[in-house]
Amino acid sequence: EMVISRDGKTRKMPAEKFFIGPATDITRMTALKKNDILVEIRLPKKWAGAKYYFEKVADRQTWDFSLVNIAMVAKTSGGKIADLRMACGGVQCTPRRMTNVEDLLKGESAGAEMEKLSKRVAAQGAKALNYNHFKIPLMGSLAARAVRSLS
């Protein structure tokens, strides 16, 4: 969750509501309003000891904006994926939570078969705009690489 401060008062906001798209407000990318400051990002305790993965693809250098990026957190138990969250950035106005991949992987063992399936379902429902069709297969490849990190 996000902790936001304004005028000495704080409020909490779920991470899912922090990033906003142009349909909400074309002038902002986040739910922060005038004089708001993001002061904390809190991760639930249930993710302590989890495996984390992040990868970005950019045209040039590490400081460039990513064309596409992926973040994943996963907990494993007994060789199986007990729980995970996966999100992709750079593919729409807000981070895209990949619930279809999450649902596919829960309770499964990481391995080549799950990599292939993740790659296939990662971009389901995604619609390319002009000149960015390459992002759709890239989403799948990054999802597969994230899953590979669990093997």
Regions found by a protein language model. Give the residues of each.
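C-terminal structural segment of proteins
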Residues: E1-S151
